[in-house]
UniProtKB/Swiss-Prot annotation:
GO cellular component: cytosol
Name listed for the protein in its UniProt record: DNA ligase
Listed Pfam families: BRCT (PF00533), DNA_ligase_aden (PF01653), DNA_ligase_OB (PF03120), DNA_ligase_ZBD (PF03119), HHH_2 (PF12826), HHH_5 (PF14520), Nlig-Ia (PF22745)
Naturally occurring in which organism (per UniProt): Pseudoalteromonas translucida (strain TAC 125)
Protein's gene: ligA
Lineage of source species: Bacteria, Pseudomonadati, Pseudomonadota, Gammaproteobacteria, Alteromonadales
NCBIfam families: dnlj, PRK07956.1
């Protein structure tokens, strides 16, 4: 009997999985929805009677599980990179040209094109064909574990079809809510008196990030796969489109508009076609993604910053509306940048209500010729940032008034300075300016800086507004009573904050330098400064020439660092912080044995086949070398990989030593790097 029940259950599962595959992957439903539901109910009833036969990959397990208290963090083994954007045909043509120049090829490229879905990127890991983990993109390196929620999405297979899949397979794609599902969901939510969402993307995000997966299971979420991440035993196909076809064979849904095209003109035609049919599609999109199809070419092109060179998101023109400019206010940022902000009559555009827009700077105001009282065209650039793009001059009222850019800071009345060659005007008040003061202290306390637990933005705002602090150093003279006087701060929270401030005094030189908020000096830069100069005094006294000797520090960053420490009020704050007990472990200069390449300048060019470019750079730096991005008379050696171009020619002209990748590997092994 048990065998018969087991056979019934297995038969129902395979039948339901086949119908799901027909419906979601092949887009050819083979039975009515009611019949599918009836079969699912039969399976559920049998599993309820025989719980020992329930498996994790059963279609009935898409109903959700126990609620979570919070999402755990998941590190992506292969980073989930973002894409560079193109907003015009010229920008896409430039992208195509850059690729061909880098490949040194005149042949037309094959592109894989697909709509850019307006949802959330997720990673789904299958182990031995079974879904074991799902995570959001997060910051690209770390995301949130949403496994239980993704399991409830109806077109996500809990078990892959077939048997030829890798032992471990990471599938990447987009979770979204189609237009019909979104409309139905909002209507039902409104009837129940619950929150309605302004657009499908917000609805998808809110649904996927539910701590209770049973709630997610009731939401009409969908998933389309678009790539892979980690794959056991290497790639599953020689080109991207073949890879997608393999995914569909294994039961994963693919956007039906995905298409292979030859050459840039065909890619542009695809873009135009999708843009024309945008309103007819069943889901929201904000552009198309265009990728080089051949995996070998993708590997040769590699990555820049946090985006691949071989793909681009060609965004659609933002949706536009007409509204009225009511006023312009000037905001002051942490670095003193003066930014004009347009206050608008609220208008619904691109899925949200917009009442503010950036005017960027004085040059943009002059270019637009805009006045207060004008009727303007507003758009959301890239469907994100509201912008004024045009003035409707025929509607200009008689009482329209010019926008006067301030000559003094609207916050502290200090002089406003506009450096030649820069579009941004800045307040010269530094840490005297309350606007900069708040942002400077928030930056100082942030996680990547001194990481002062409990010192949130609202507390900083209150401390500055009440004039309890004027500089970061003032934080360390505050007593528990000062914090207890703030809104929503009880004795326990105040005591914890005092303790956190004391704990934060023990830091590193790199974090301390980062906490000062020097323009364009990020985490990597301040770490390199600390490693190079070893002491705060050395950094303070460093000349621009000596600063540019630091790895990854160019003349612009060096100038910002030098200018910061040339200002006495900045030095006063630094000295006060040290006097308050900020400290870090003493750094000792590495020995000649530890850094045998100290003082030497290397340049990497071309494709490295054995070493990862970033790994090679890091290993050279560990041995004391400076790795530069350009060849000059100061370069000691050039490492030339395959397809080395103009840098190799210049190095040969200058008589600079040229190393092969094999030479570099031998050099690193010689010095145990």
């Amino acid at each position: 009997m048990a065998s018969s029940i087991s056979e019934q259950i297995n038969h129902l599962r395979s039948t339901l999985e086949q119908h799901s595959y027909n419906y979601y992957v092949l887009d050819t439903p083979s039975i009515p929805d009611a019949e599918y539901d009836r079969l699912l109910q039969q399976l559920s009833a049998l599993e309820t009677q025989h719980p020992e036969l329930i498996t994790a990959d059963s279609p009935t397990q898409k109903v959700g599980g126990a609620a979570l208290s919070k999402f755990e963090q998941v590190a992506h083994q292969v980073p989930m990179l973002s894409l560079d954007n193109a907003f015009s045909e010229d920008e896409f043509i430039a992208f195509n040209r850059r690729i061909k120049e880098r490949l040194m090829s005149t042949e037309e490229l094959t592109f894989c094109c697909e709509p850019k879905l307006d949802g959330l990127a997720v990673s789904i890991i299958y182990r031995d064909g079974v879904l074991v983990q799902a995570a959001t993109r997060g910051d690209g390196l770390t995301g949130e574990n949403v496994t239980q929620n993704v399991k409830t999405i109806r077109n996500v297979p809990l078990k892959l079809r077939g048997s030829d899949y890798p032992a471990e397979l990471e599938v990447r794609g987009e979770v979204f809510m189609d237009n019909a599902g979104f409309e139905k969901f909002n209507i039902e939510a409104e009837k129940r008196g619950e929150k309605v969402f302004v657009n499908p993307r917000n609805a998808a995000a809110g649904s996927l990030r539910q701590l209770d997966s049973k709630i997610t299971a009731k939401r009409p979420l969908m998933f389309y796969a678009y790539s892979t991440g980690l794959v056991a035993d290497g790639s599953i196909a020689e080109d991207h489109y073949q890879q997608l076809e393999k995914l569909t064979d294994w039961g994963l849904p693919l956007c039906p508009e995905t298409k292979l095209v030859e050459g840039p003109q065909a890619a542009l035609a695809y873009y135009t076609d999708i843009l024309t049919r945008r309103g007819e599609l069943k889901y929201e999109i904000d552009g198309v993604v265009i990728k080089i199809n051949q995996k070998a070419l993708q590997e040769r092109l590699g990555f820049v910053a946090r985006a691949p060179r071989w793909a681009i998101a060609y965004k659609f023109p933002a949706q536009e509306e007409i509204t009225k400019l009511l006023d312009v206010e000037f905001q002051v940022g942490r670095t003193g940048a003066i930014t004009p902000v347009a206050r608008l009559e609220p208008v619904f555009v691109g899925g949200v209500t917009v009442s503010n827009a950036t005017l960027h700077n004085g040059d943009e105001i002059a270019r637009l010729g805009v006045k207060v009282g004008d009727t303007v065209i507003i758009r959301r650039a890239g469907d994100v940032i509201p912008q004024i793009t045009q003035v409707v001059l025929e509607r200009r009222p008689d009482d329209a008034r010019d926008i006067e850019f301030p000559v003094t800071c609207p916050i502290c009345d200090s002089h406003v300075e506009k450096v030649e060659g820069e579009a941004v005007a800045r307040c010269t008040g530094g840490l005297v300016c309350p606007a900069q003061r708040k942002q400077a202290i928030k930056h100082f306390a942030s996680r990547k800086a001194l990481d002062i637990d409990g010192l949130g933005d609202k507390i900083v705002d209150q401390l500055v507004d009440r004039e309890l602090i004027k500089t970061p150093a003032d934080l360390f003279i505050l007593k528990q009573g000062h914090f207890e006087s703030l809104e929503r701060m009880g004795p326990k929270s105040a005591k914890n904050l005092v303790t956190a401030l004391q704990d934060a005094k023990a830091t590193t030189l790199a974090k301390f330098l980062y906490s000062l908020g020097i323009r364009e000096a990020g985490e990597a830069t301040t770490q390199n400064l600390a490693n190079h100069f070893l002491t705060l005094e050395n950094v303070i006294n460093a000349s621009i020439d000596s600063l540019t000797q630091v790895s990854d520090v160019g003349e612009i960053v060096a100038t910002h660092v030098r200018s910061f420490f040339a200002e006495q009020h900045n030095l006063d704050v630094v000295n006060a912080l040290v006097e308050q007990g900020i400290n870090w472990p003493e750094l000792t200069p590495p020995s000649a044995q530890e850094q045998p390449l100290a003082g030497l300048v290397y340049v990497l060019t071309g494709t490295l086949n054995t070493l990862n470019r970033n790994d090679a750079k890091a290993r050279l730096q560990q041995l004391g070398a400076k790795v530069s991005g350009s060849v000059s008379a100061k370069t000691d050696a050039l490492v030339a990989g395959e397809k080395a171009g103009s840098k190799l020619t210049k190095a040969q002209d200058l008589g600079i030593d040229v190393l092969t990748e094999e030479d570099l590997i031998n050099l690193l092994e010689q010095h145990n790097g």
